[in-house]
């Protein structure tokens, strides 16, 4: 197998078959947390944070360790990036020492710049535009509740709320790659960028999926297999909650809205969740919620992704399955 450097910067960096490989590997890691250890040595993986994190920090830190490696966790305050060092300079230095870079940051251009100067895999752990690691965990969760990865193509998934945010973008692209029927619903002024919708529709045409963007929450949820939402207010906007939340109340996931979905529909939320706002307690703490499975699967999906990317970079086919 010829070595091939690959990064995961946005959800369509994997094609349909590659996404299936990663998800199937994630399920194997769920059954055996030490299934493979590509970083045995230990080899270091740099895990950078420009934003606060609970699930991403813990899942990548524990995940790299379980893969046999050493997670070098660096916060913005402890990095020269926080003092204005060019991304390219940081990338060149880390590339000499670490076997991969995971970065939770703001602009998408920053992870793209990191990848440009890296000879090891770079993973987007969240930017303002995309959250591909979360989507892999979410799809793993659906697969585990629906009889396997092959059944993802039969699923209708719905995202409600701020349809212009990174989660909406990633559901559109990742769902299209999976061949799902993807629906996103949000108020006017909070709909996805036309270029992302166009990319999703192009991919869906190849995989047998479909894309619907609407302002009608009830239309979106009708007969859905899985309903997703996210907080209405992003990090740093908490002081504006009362103002920012006004357009979103019609998109709250409650029992009335869930009743429009299929009777066995799943509910997922990337967390943190604000009960009584984007979702009611009856839903997130109810029998249709698989939120805690979803949160755990961040660990397994990210380990699978790092293993798969490392296998590609090293030309080691044994790490791909």
Language model feature labels by segment:
Residues 39-45, 152-155, 264:
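Phosphate-coordination loops involved in phosphoryl transfer and adenosine-cofactor binding
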Residues 38-143, 275:
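Phosphate/diphosphate ligand-binding glycine-rich loop within oxidoreductases
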Residues 151-152, 176, 256-264, 286:
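Short, conserved loop/helix-junction motifs that constitute active-site signature segments
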Residues 264-265, 270-321:
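Adenosine-phosphate binding glycine-rich loop
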Residues 50-65, 144-229:
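Glycine-rich phosphate/diphosphate-binding loop of Rossmann-like nucleotide-binding domains
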């Amino acid at each position: 197998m010829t070595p091939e450097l690959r990064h995961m910067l946005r959800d369509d960096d994997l094609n349909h078959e590659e996404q299936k490989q990663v998800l199937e590997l994630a399920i194997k890691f769920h059954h055996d947390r030490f299934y493979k250890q590509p970083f045995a040595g230990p080899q270091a993986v740099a895990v950078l944070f420009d934003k606060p994190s609970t699930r991403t920090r813990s899942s990548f830190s524990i995940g790299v360790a379980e893969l046999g490696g050493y997670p070098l966790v660096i916060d913005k305050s402890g990095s020269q990036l926080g003092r204005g060092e060019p991304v390219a300079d940081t990338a060149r230095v880390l590339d000499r020492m670490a076997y991969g870079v995971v970065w939770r940051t703001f602009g998408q251009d920053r992870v793209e710049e990191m990848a440009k100067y890296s000879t090891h895999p770079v993973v987007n752990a969240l930017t303002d535009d995309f959250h591909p690691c979360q989507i892999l965990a979410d799809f793993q969760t659906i697969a585990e509740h629906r009889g396997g990865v092959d059944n993802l193509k039969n699923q209708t998934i719905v995202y409600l709320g701020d349809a212009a945010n990174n989660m909406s973008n990633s559901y559109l692209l990742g769902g299209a790659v999976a061949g799902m029927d993807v629906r996103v619903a949000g108020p006017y002024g909070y709909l996805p960028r036309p270029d992302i919708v166009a990319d999703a529709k192009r991919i869906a045409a190849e995989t047998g999926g479909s894309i619907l963007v609407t302002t009608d929450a009830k239309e979106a949820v009708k007969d859905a297999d899985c309903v997703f939402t996210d907080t209405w207010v992003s990090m740093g906007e908490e002081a504006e909650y009362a103002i920012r939340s006004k357009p979103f109340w019609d998109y709250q996931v409650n029992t009335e809205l869930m009743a429009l979905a299929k009777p066995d529909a799943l509910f997922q939320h990337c967390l943190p969740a604000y009960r009584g706002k984007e979702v009611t307690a009856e839903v997130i703490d109810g029998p249709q919620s698989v939120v805690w499975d979803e949160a755990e699967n961040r660990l397994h999906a990210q380990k699978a992704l790092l293993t798969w990317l490392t296998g590609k970079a090293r030309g080691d086919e044994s790490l791909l399955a």
